[in-house]
């Protein structure tokens, strides 16, 4: 089984991925790790590399290609990243696709705390990164990153603990797998 976890910055992707990993024993892989590594190799911050990628599509194609190849060849994994679910959809890679969300304010507080920066600076960086990513994904792949129709479950993390979100997601996976297996038998008897 592959589980993808997507969401905007500060929605809880990394934290929830780790919680699901604790329960399932699956390893977590972050698409952001590939992107950060590429930025580091070029001596750029994430924000600078995002701007660079806007005019150098090969930066995104390389990162996304690595993620696609990885997901095609590995199982029992959790892949966390903005495009993880979309990559599975585009390339018909079997996965349970999760999208996490929270209000902008909550995401700002989380991002500010994680990065150790003031809220105003966090707002500027968050907005800049999200605008850049939305434009790039639309230009490169024709993907509207705000289209949630591809996901198997969409979860508001605003008032839930990460452990609760993990259990909700895993219960939904269990529910869907049982439904696919048992529903036809039930219907035949009616």
Swiss-Prot record:
Keywords: ATP-binding, Cytoplasm, Kinase, Nucleotide-binding, Transferase. The keyword Transmembrane does not apply. GO terms for cellular component: cytoplasm. Its main location: cytoplasm. It comes from the Archaea. One of its GO terms (biological process) is pyrimidine nucleotide metabolic process. CDD domains: CMPK. Coiled coil: none annotated. Its EC number is 2.7.4.25. ATP binds at residues 7-15. Belongs to the cytidylate kinase family. Type 2 subfamily. This is Cytidylate kinase. It comes from Thermoplasma volcanium (strain ATCC 51530 / DSM 4299 / JCM 9571 / NBRC 15438 / GSS1).
């Amino acid at each position: 089984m592959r589980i993808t976890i997507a969401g905007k910055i500060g929605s809880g992707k990394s934290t929830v991925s780790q919680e699901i990993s604790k329960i399932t024993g699956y390893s977590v892989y972050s698409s952001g790790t590939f992107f950060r590594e590429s930025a580091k190799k070029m001596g750029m911050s994430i924000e600078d590399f995002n701007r660079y990628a806007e005019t150098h599509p090969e930066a995104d194609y390389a990162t996304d290609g690595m993620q696609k190849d990885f997901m095609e060849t590995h199982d029992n994994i959790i892949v966390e990243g903005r495009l993880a679910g979309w990559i599975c959809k585009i390339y018909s890679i079997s996965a349970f696709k999760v999208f996490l969300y929270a209000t902008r304010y909550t995401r700002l507080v989380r991002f500010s705390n994680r990065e150790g920066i003031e809220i105003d600076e966090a707002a500027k960086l968050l907005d800049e990164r999200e605008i850049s990513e939305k434009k790039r994904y639309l230009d490169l792949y024709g993907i509207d990153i705000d289209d949630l129709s591809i996901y198997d479950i969409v979860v508001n993390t605003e008032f839930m603990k990460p452990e609760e979100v993990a259990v909700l997601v895993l219960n939904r996976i269990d529910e869907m797998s049982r439904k696919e297996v048992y529903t036809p038998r039930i219907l035949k008897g009616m």
